[in-house]
């Protein structure tokens, strides 16, 4: 045993323990203060839970947003390892066994069970990457039959997008990990045997999330986990100062409640290292619940409950039929054999199942002894191969059967599956725990028997005669098949809980829309199997990842929409076509976002002039003294003193002002309508202050036609200039940086020609 380390007042860049430097944790994670108290703009997305799906969706929001969105990822646990534990040497990290009651201390270092139930569960891995560091890797698609109870739009989406996720996770190509003589022989024999088992529909290549061969020039990532993609994204973002950094991961941050006002989440309550904290969020900020099916649903029930939440709870019926058959029944095989794996799909009127088949010529009951691991020592590899049984092949048929959810479940009915907040049990933070009632109905039990019988029938058909097969149960080999129910796992052991926040088009009969957004919460989303309307027999990972990509895309497109047809997007990562006049600068924050620094100056678009147009600009400020503006119709700059040429835009163009104080430099007073946000500076007053609170995105819609300029701010007409007072009716567009310390961000700068300008451009292009 070693002494517990206590934090002290001294600070270090990287903490040192008795055995190691915490380089991984320090380089990937941030403290709460580093993420929240850095003087930066508010977050555009907050993801709760850095487990299998939280890490994935956070990375997708960051990547798809091309740096335009500021993302915060909150994780209740700490950092453990940076990839799947089976990609490491024999390190001794294992998934925890199921328990009925959590002992109050971590099991296997990071595992805890935060809910209570009528059945045993392994619980959650409280660490970055979560259960994706331990999962089995099986990733089958949902079939057409599985999807029949899903909304048609999602059926189409999944079929069109599954392959992108398969390529990302290593499922495609399918046979780069499992191949060889044993696979070829067993696949051929299995294809034949499958035709003789009535409920079997077919045999497929094993869909395993393992990349054994990478694209040219790259190393394979081996078994997939969400941790490496998150780590890479965090390190990519780490080059920026905290005040402009786009992705933060804060561990030891346990979210206990989401506070909302009129259907808008406005604060996240959490405990950070035991201290109560509140993170304020704006209506623009997407909050994604990705803390597992049970915990995400518990958090939703605690924060903004609806009667449907917690119904439709599903998991999988799982069995493990282990046999060994005579090696001779598979024909002549080489002396040394690699492992083999394949997927067998089946169906009955009661539901669908699949069998995950693994095989190895080893002396023992573990057909996966030479799979799912790194073997760094060639002598150890020789020992493993030498342990092969030259007369037998051990095969495991892991049956996975679907459960049908009950969308009308009552939380007082013990005969059906559901979850709710417990009225009797609170967690260490004083919040109600979830209670999970998970049961197999009589129909499910009948189906479970059928699935188990199919596994035995398939094994017997492979063996040919009873003399060629033995069955493993009760820790011994037997000549008789296992009795009914003997090889089953508990209902809570699969890690496949799903359905309690299901998606749909009708708010009266579903909880989330088809993008994973809560029907009744403007900025609330969820990710993971909780979204599933129905589960099918397929492991939920591939489908949940694919849906998370859709949710991330919806969040990004809401913040950074694609320009409409006929609309020109002016901003770009290289600021191509833009030039700085005066002092100061604009910093590129994302592919479509810039932030002012210093001043006074003007970033102006040089490529072309605009006459009649509709200009849309989103902007936000962080301090009441921030000042900026959008300039229109000014002549070419740069012909005079570079430090002064911006003044030409002031003297001859038009400025739509950004200054909520309405400061008038002529009288040194505030509250001037001619100098207030939305005014055409000193030409047309703002009739009202329509800007949103500091930190929130505002939208200008500026319509210029002839001498007429109308300014709408967040949908309200705030100023109208009807007399151009001799100023140009055509010119350039620019963004102002006003003074040192003023920070204003701009994004989505879209311009569309209207009216006479469109006709003139058409005429010019036809010549």
Question: What is each stretch, according to the model?
Answer:
Residues 1-44, 63, 67, 557, ...:
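Extreme N-terminal leader/targeting segments of oxidoreductases
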Residues 43-72:
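N-terminal Rossmann-like FAD-binding beta1-loop-alpha1 element of flavoenzymes
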Residues 62-89, 258, 269-343, 528, ...:
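Glycine-rich loop(s) and the adjacent beta-strand/alpha-helix scaffold that form part
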Residues 78, 289-291, 296-297, 301-411, ...:
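Mid-to-C-terminal "cap/lid" subdomains and adjacent gly/pro-rich loops that border
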Residues 84-85, 91-179, 185, 405-425:
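Redox-cofactor-proximal catalytic regions of oxidoreductases
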Residues 145-146, 151-257, 261, 466-473, ...:
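Conserved redox-cofactor binding core of oxidoreductases
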Residues 250-251, 256-257, 450-533:
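A glycine-rich dinucleotide-binding beta-alpha-beta segment and adjacent secondary-structure elements
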Residues 563-767:
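Carbohydrate-interacting regions of secretory-pathway proteins
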């Amino acid at each position: 045993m070693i002494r517990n380390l206590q934090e002290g007042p001294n600070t270090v860049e990287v903490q040192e323990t008795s055995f190691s430097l915490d380089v991984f944790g320090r380089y990937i994670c941030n403290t709460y203060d580093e993420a929240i108290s850095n003087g930066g703009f508010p977050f555009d997305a907050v993801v709760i839970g850095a487990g299998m799906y939280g890490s994935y969706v956070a990375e997708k929001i960051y990547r798809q947003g091309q740096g335009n969105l500021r993302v915060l990822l909150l994780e209740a646990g700490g950092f453990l390892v940076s990839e799947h534990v089976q990609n490491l040497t024999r390190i001794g990290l294992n998934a925890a066994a199921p328990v009925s009651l959590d002992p109050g201390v971590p099991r296997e270092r990071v595992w805890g069970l935060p809910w209570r139930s009528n059945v045993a569960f392994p619980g959650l891995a409280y660490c970055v990457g979560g259960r994706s560091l331990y999962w089995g890797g099986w990733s089958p698609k949902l079939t057409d039959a599985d999807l029949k109870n899903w909304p048609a739009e999602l059926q189409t989406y999944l079929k069109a997008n599954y392959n992108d996720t398969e390529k990302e996770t290593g499922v495609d190509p399918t046979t780069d990990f499992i191949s060889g003589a044993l696979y070829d022989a067993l696949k051929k024999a299995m294809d034949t045997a499958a035709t003789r088992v009535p409920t079997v529909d077919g045999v497929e290549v094993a869909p395993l999330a393992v990349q054994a061969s990478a694209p040219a020039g790259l190393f394979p990532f081996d078994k997939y986990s969400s941790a490496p993609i998150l780590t890479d994204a965090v390190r990519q973002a780490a080059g920026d100062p905290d005040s402009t950094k786009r992705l933060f991961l804060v561990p030891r941050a346990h979210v206990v409640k989401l506070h909302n006002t009129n259907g808008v989440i406005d604060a996240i309550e959490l405990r950070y290292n035991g201290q109560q904290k509140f993170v304020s969020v704006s209506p623009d900020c997407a909050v994604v619940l990705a803390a597992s099916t049970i915990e995400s649903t518990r958090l939703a029930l605690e924060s903004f409950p609806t009667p449907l939440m917690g119904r439709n709870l599903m998991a999988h019926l799982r069995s493990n039929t282990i046999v060994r058959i005579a090696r001779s029944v598979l024909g002549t095989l080489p002396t040394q054999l690699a492992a083999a794996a394949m997927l067998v799909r089946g169906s009955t009127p009661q539901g669908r199942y699949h069998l995950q088949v693994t095989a190895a010529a080893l002396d023992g009951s573990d057909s996966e002894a030479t799979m799912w691991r790194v073997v760094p020592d060639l002598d150890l590899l020789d020992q493993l191969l030498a342990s092969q049984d030259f007369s037998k092949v051990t095969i495991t048929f892991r049956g996975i059967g679907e459960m049908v959810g009950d969308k009308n479940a009552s939380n007082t009915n013990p005969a059906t599956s559901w979850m709710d907040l417990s009225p009797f049990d609170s967690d260490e933070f004083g919040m109600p725990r979830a209670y999970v009632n998970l049961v197999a109905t009589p129909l499910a039990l009948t189906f479970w028997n059928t699935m188990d019988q199919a596994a035995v029938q398939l094994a017997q058909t492979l063996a040919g005669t009873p003399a060629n097969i033995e069955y493993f149960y009760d820790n011994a080999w037997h000549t008789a098949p296992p009795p009914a129910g003997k090889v089953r796992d508990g209902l809570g052991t699969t890690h496949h809980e799903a359905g309690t926040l299901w998606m749909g088009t009708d708010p009266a009969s579903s909880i989330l829309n088809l993008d994973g957004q809560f029907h009744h919460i403007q900025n609330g989303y969820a990710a993971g199997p909780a979204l599933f309307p129905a589960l099918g027999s397929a492991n939920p990972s591939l489908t949940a990842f694919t849906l998370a990509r859709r949710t991330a895309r919806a969040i990004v497109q809401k913040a950074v929409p694609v320009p409409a047809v006929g609309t020109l997007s002016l901003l770009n990562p290289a600021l191509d076509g833009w030039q700085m006049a005066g002092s100061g600068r604009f910093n590129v924050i994302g592919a479509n976002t810039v932030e002012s620094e210093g001043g006074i100056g003007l970033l102006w678009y040089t490529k072309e002039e605009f006459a009649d147009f509709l200009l849309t600009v989103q902007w936000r400020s962080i301090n009441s003294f921030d000042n900026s503006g959008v300039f229109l119709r000014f002549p070419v700059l740069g012909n005079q003193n570079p430090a002064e040429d911006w003044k030409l835009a002031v003297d001859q163009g038009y400025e739509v002002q950004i200054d909520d104080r309405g400061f008038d430099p002529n009288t040194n007073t505030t509250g001037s309508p001619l100098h207030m946000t939305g005014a055409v500076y000193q030409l047309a007053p703002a009739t009202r202050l329509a800007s949103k609170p500091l930190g929130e995105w505002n939208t200008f819609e500026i319509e210029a036609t002839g001498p007429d300029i109308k300014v709408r701010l967040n949908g309200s007409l705030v100023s109208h200039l009807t007399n151009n007072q001799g100023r140009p009716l055509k010119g350039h567009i620019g963004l102002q940086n006003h003074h040192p310390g003023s920070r204003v961000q701009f994004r989505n700068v879209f311009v569309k020609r209207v009216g006479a300008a469109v006709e003139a451009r058409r005429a010019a292009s036809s010549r």
